Structures are given as C-alpha cells and as structure tokens.
C-alpha cells in the first residue's frame, strides 16, 4: 500500500498534548483495531501496549461491546438525566457500580464524560457539601506533586505536573500540593520505605496545620500514580495519610480513573492499599474506552447532605448534556459484565507475573534507573549512572528515542520525558507478551547504543 500519511501533514486539529512543531510532521493515523493490535492507514500493525490511553482493557475488537452500543442506538440513542428524568441503562449502571465498590459504602453515582470532568465534579461536590454544613472557609484541596487528575481547569490545577500549569495561570489558589511518594527518587540515605512514608505523612500534617485544618476540605490521590510513571505507594503510606485525614475531618477523593476495574490485579486500585475513600472517580476501563463515560461515586455521608441542601435552595445545579448517556451506559454495563464473567482480576494476575518479571529482567541496563510496576502497569525510567539525581540531557530525548524504536519494530508505548509507560490490554496473549518483551529488548539495545554515541560526542 502506498504511504498516504503525507496528506495529513499540517492537519486541521489542535491536538491534545502536542507541540506546534509536531503539527508539521506526519501524524500517526490509526485506522483500525484488532485485539491487542492497532493498524495505521498504511496497514502497519502495532502492538498497543498502552491500551490506547490506559483504557482499551478488552482490546479493540470486543463484539459484545459493539453489539451493546448498536442495540441501544436502535432503542434510545439519547436522552438526558436532568430534572429527575433518566434512562434505564444509566440507572442500571449506577446500581452496578455501587454494588461493585466495597471498600466503603457508596450511596450515589454522578455520571460525567471523562476522568477530568469527574475530578472537576469532585471539587464542586466537596465545596457544596461544606457550604451546606456552614463551613464556607473549608475549600482547599491537597493533591500531590507529579499526579495527573485531568486537564480541565480544576483537574489540571490538581495535577502536579508543571507543564500543565505553565501559561494557563494554574494551579488556582485553592489547590495545594504535597510531596510525591516516590521512594526510589526521594528517599534519604538509609531511610526505609516506612520511614519515608512517616516523613511524608508528617509533612502533609504540617501543611494542613500551616494552612489551617478548618480551610482544608479534601485530599485527592491515585492509588498508583499512572501518568507520572506508575509510582507505587511506599509501605504504610496510605494508612498514615488516612489517619491524618480523619484527624482533621478532611475528605479522601480516590482517583481510580487509571487503576479501576482490574488494572492493578484488584477490582479497584484502592483495594490493594486499604484505601477507604469518601469519593471515587472512575473512567477509562469503565467502558474499555469504547464510549466516553466516567462516574463519581459519592458516600452516604456526603450525598445525604447534598440532597438535603438542594431541597432548601431548589436544586443541585451541576451536570452535563451527556451525563449518563444511554449508549455509553449500555456499553459500560456490558464491559462490567465481561469483567465479572471472565474474573478479570484473576486474568490480570495470571499474566502480570510474566509481564512484570519479563521486563524487570532488563533492569540491569546501564541506562535504566528503575523499572517499576504492578499488575498490568509498568514504567521504565531512563537515567545516567542508575541514579535519580543524574537525568540524561533533555535534548538527548532518551525516552522519546526508545519509544520511536518500539514503534519502528511494531509496538506503541507512552514516552513522557525519560520514563516510558506500558499498560497493555487485559486479554493480551502469552504469544503477544513474548512479542512485547522481545521488541522492548530490541528497542533498549538500540537506545543503549544511541546513548553511548551521544556520550562519545560529548567528550
């Protein structure tokens, strides 16, 4: 097939998370998907090791999801959920989500279209809740450095990634950031994981006391930081954090957008770390990425106050045209059925051991500082001298080069700076996993050679 991507150079999209110079290059245009693979418009086949953007957990050709969408489109393609009007798929999905989440008793579900909107909604819920309780000063939200919570105004402010703040006048003044719990990168010499967790918890408490506990409303955290590079919490971290939050009556918002529905080998990421949140955000795997949908799970403690207050003032005035879209809800319901029928956490745990061990076998590479992960999520961090304090020069673009070599050999990864994320579909076969490990090794060998060349030029 002739190469036809040139016709899309200088295309008309203002693309997300894309620099201007990239718009003058040929874009990678994906045309179709099949299982764990995607194909570009020239017919080249790629193993998709990021499940699109952490979401296509059931791969790209799950006919049951397509059939669920078609059936709903032929029955009721759209109706809204405003003014106590709704649809059966949205009611059924809300009930199913409440039944599935067992770490804490949740009472209500609010539907949005993306994880960003879900986390934006969380902040408005928290504010509404505290206003209803007569605590208008209790509005600040504590997030963490390196976290990713979305790209709307509030969710981008919550995110602890400077490029998401620069030129956007972010973060807003009501958002505070505490430290990233990355033990490998930030522990002191001789400090154990538990001691590191204690130090971070003490610093969190100091921040709360400095701001005034009466002004701090909530703390938001991903069980495992995803986009930041699959950063796992150190031992006892969340136990200590939750003790402090309870002490000062601060709500816990669990951002399960990446971790939820089996990614870490548990149905929700918080199950792995004994997290008992007041509010939960879910998205991505909720529909396996087949339809845009997200949800906020609200505890009885919060929903009862919100509903009571709305009776006094006339309404809870927040929502989106497509909240609880019937087609998206029908697809999500079918995805959740598949997860249950196939015992998806068992599937993930079965294949994840080989996934983690197969890739961590490359950890001795002189250009790798750390390979970290759990379940079907893994990140490789490239550094010099195997030290977090010795990053490669920015212009060397080591992670980007590795990602380009993976693509050359037929595999797509996420390269952000000098860390590379992988989160493959749950239905990845053992043969596909062998292919993943083989291509990773080839791309790593190329990258090691490239770094040696750059070092020799620098001398």
Swiss-Prot record:
It catalyses: vanillin + L-alanine = vanillylamine + pyruvate. Pathway: Aromatic compound metabolism; phenylpropanoid biosynthesis. The keyword Coiled coil applies. Expressed in placental tissue of immature fruit. Keywords: Aminotransferase, Coiled coil, Pyridoxal phosphate, Transferase. The keyword Transferase applies. Its EC number is 2.6.1.119. Gene3D superfamilies: Aspartate Aminotransferase, domain 1, Type I PLP-dependent aspartate aminotransferase-like (Major domain). Pyridoxal 5'-phosphate binds at residues 115-116, 255, 320-321. Residues 428-459 form a coiled coil. Signal peptide: none annotated. Disruption phenotype: Low pungency phenotype, characterized by low levels of capsaicinoids, and accumulation of high levels of capsinoids, which are non-pungent capsaicinoid analogs. The modification N6-(pyridoxal phosphate)lysine is found at residue 284. Belongs to the class-III pyridoxal-phosphate-dependent aminotransferase family. NCBIfam families: PRK06105.1. Involved in the biosynthesis of capsaicinoids natural products, pungent alkaloids synthesized from phenylpropanoid intermediates in the placental tissue of chili pepper fruit acting as repellant on herbivorous mammals and conferring spiciness to hot peppers. Can transfer an amine from vanillylamine to pyruvate forming vanillin and L-alanine. Can use pyruvate or oxaloacetate, but not 2-oxoglutarate as amino group acceptors. Is able to convert (S)-1-phenylethylamine into acetophenone in vitro. This is Vanillin aminotransferase. It comes from Capsicum chinense (Scotch bonnet).
